[in-house]
Curated annotation (Swiss-Prot):
Taxonomic superkingdom: Eukaryota
Major localization listed first in the record, in broad terms: membrane
Protein name in UniProt: Taste receptor type 2 member 7
A UniProt-annotated Pfam family: TAS2R
Membrane topology: Multi-pass membrane protein
Subcellular location, record wording: Membrane
Originating species: Pongo pygmaeus (Bornean orangutan)
Extracellular topological segments: 1-9, 77-94, 150-187, 257-266
Function comment: Gustducin-coupled receptor implicated in the perception of bitter compounds in the oral cavity and the gastrointestinal tract. Signals through PLCB2 and the calcium-regulated cation channel TRPM5.
Cysteine-cysteine disulfides: none
Side Cytoplasmic, residues: 31-55, 116-128, 209-235, 288-318
Keywords attached to this entry: G-protein coupled receptor, Glycoprotein, Membrane, Receptor, Sensory transduction, Taste, Transducer, Transmembrane, Transmembrane helix
Molecular functions per Gene Ontology: bitter taste receptor activity; G protein-coupled receptor activity
Matches recorded under Gene3D superfamilies: Rhodopsin 7-helix transmembrane proteins (1.20.1070.10)
Length: 318
């Protein structure tokens, strides 16, 4: 029964992976083609492309971990291979979260309407420094990933199922509590960008409230371009917050799996939930971006035209 559930969850993970790769690759491809065409890239496109690339890598690492856990559990007993996987998981995990936070910050500075001198100064400079902010996020993620990977592998990453002729069911090299504590600290490290994103969300709400009040006083209505921009930004930010909470809880499940009898099943279940975040959020970003939305509609229209043309040819041959 356990093997059937694991296989089902693995197929689910493959489906989520395919959807996520499709959405994120589309974002990266459209922005890169536009970059080549115009020979320059807008700040928002740079953030979205960086976010898409980091999520493609994150999806690959999570799916690879699922396959190893189900098909080759003994690989967890080797330090070198798992050290590489651990490093790239921590790196891509932090990169994707920090890049999404950068997107929320960018929306806040470009759309919100405040008149504080510090806000106006940062609003004016955000396009100039966004590339440096993204580079700083990369350096910070590497700085976190290297020592964290060493600590995880020094204590051994996981309690692996020992497939031996002895009566041993589980072979563990580390104290489970100590290892779970390290994993928990890694998860807590992602709360900082989450709090920054949450702050941007509330400030955007405050800015929208003030803007609507000004529109009502001037009797110009509430559905102007600035209001629409606020609403689109809020949708993107709140979707990230909700999906991140589910993503965070999924890794809490994976961490607590060290104390469960069916450790492998709990980890795969947690990782199948974790795949929802990088997979589905890309489509929310596509719908919220005019260029990406129009490009996706063109692709859908072309695909439908090709399918209709094939059906017409088949009907004509009959």
């Amino acid at each position: 029964m356990t093997d059937k559930v694991q296989t089902t969850l693995l197929f689910l993970a493959v489906g989520e992976f395919s959807v996520g790769i499709l959405g994120n690759a589309f974002i990266g491809l459209v922005n890169c083609m536009d970059w080549i065409k115009k020979r320059k890239i807008a700040s928002i496109d740079l953030i979205l492309t960086s976010l898409a690339i980091s999520r493609i890598c994150l999806l690959c690492v999570i799916l690879l971990d699922c396959f190893i856990l189900v098909l080759y559990p003994d690989v967890y007993a080797t330090g070198k291979e798992m050290r590489i996987i651990d490093f790239f998981w921590i790196l891509t995990n932090h990169l994707s979260i920090w890049f999404a936070t950068c997107l929320s910050i960018y929306y806040f500075f470009k759309i919100a309407n405040f008149f504080h001198p510090l806000f106006l100064w940062m609003k004016w400079r955000i396009d100039r420094v966004i590339s440096w902010i993204l580079l700083g996020c990369m350096v910070l993620s590497v700085f976190i990933s290297l020592p964290a990977t060493e600590n995880l592998n020094a204590d051994f990453r996981f309690c692996v199922k020992a497939k031996r002729k002895t009566n041993l069911t589980w072979s563990c090299r580390v104290n489970k509590t100590q290892h779970a504590s390290i994993k928990l600290l890694l998860n807590l490290a992602t709360l900082l960008p989450f709090c920054v994103c949450l702050m941007s969300f509330f400030l955007l709400i405050l800015s929208l409230r003030r803007h609507i009040r000004r529109m009502q006083l001037s009797a110009t209505g509430c559905r102007d371009p600035s209001t629409e921009a606020h609403v689109r930004a809020l949708k993107a930010v709140i979707s990230f917050l909700l999906l991140f909470i589910a993503y965070y809880l999924s890794f809490l499940i994976a961490t607590s799996s060290y104390f469960m009898p069916e450790t492998e099943l709990a980890v795969i279940f947690g990782e199948s939930i974790a795949l929802i975040y990088p997979s589905s959020h890309s489509f929310i970003l596509i719908l919220g971006n005019n260029k990406l939305r129009h490009a996706s509609l063109k692709v859908i229209w072309k695909v439908m035209s090709i399918l209709k043309g094939r059906k017409f040819q088949q009907h004509k041959q009959i």
